[in-house]
């Protein structure tokens, strides 16, 4: 496997995402973490902020690149000459959604394959949405996101509570 693409919004990146990145980077020559630009969806962090945070937490993984994209994932894949999409799965409901997306991507380009990776069980409950919700209500996010981005989240949420 040469180049694989791990797409998502990563708003913000979680320890579950990072688990998939670390594992996926071991089975390909190059892993592109592709941050989706979705103008219809207002995120907590801008695309540039998300890209910067992911670069920070993956800096020790020499074969991981972080880029943003808009439009069809298939077009981005062609531009990057990649034929493999990496998708992390937490639950059966994730599988149902991602399976449909994989079929659509394969319909658009039969040369594209989707590889599903199960998230480590200790992160199976974790989502970016739940991280934002916990942070907004003053909960501790230390076990949910990489340490390097906790200050970014606190600053965005404007919350001063310290995790102990």
Curated annotation (Swiss-Prot):
Record: residues binding substrate: 9, 41, 73, 87
Subcellular localization(s) per the UniProt record: Cytoplasm
Site positions for Transition state stabilizer: 17
Annotated pathway: Cofactor biosynthesis; coenzyme A biosynthesis; CoA from (R)-pantothenate: step 4/5
Listed EC numbers: 2.7.7.3
Enzyme type, top EC level: transferase
Cellular component, GO annotation: cytoplasm
Disulfide cysteine pairs (residue numbers): none
Catalyzed reactions per annotation: (R)-4'-phosphopantetheine + ATP + H(+) = 3'-dephospho-CoA + diphosphate
Family, similarity comment: Belongs to the bacterial CoaD family.
Role summary: Reversibly transfers an adenylyl group from ATP to 4'-phosphopantetheine, yielding dephospho-CoA (dPCoA) and pyrophosphate.
Name the UniProt record assigns to this protein: Phosphopantetheine adenylyltransferase
Species the sequence originates in: Clostridium botulinum (strain 657 / Type Ba4)
Gene for this chain: coaD
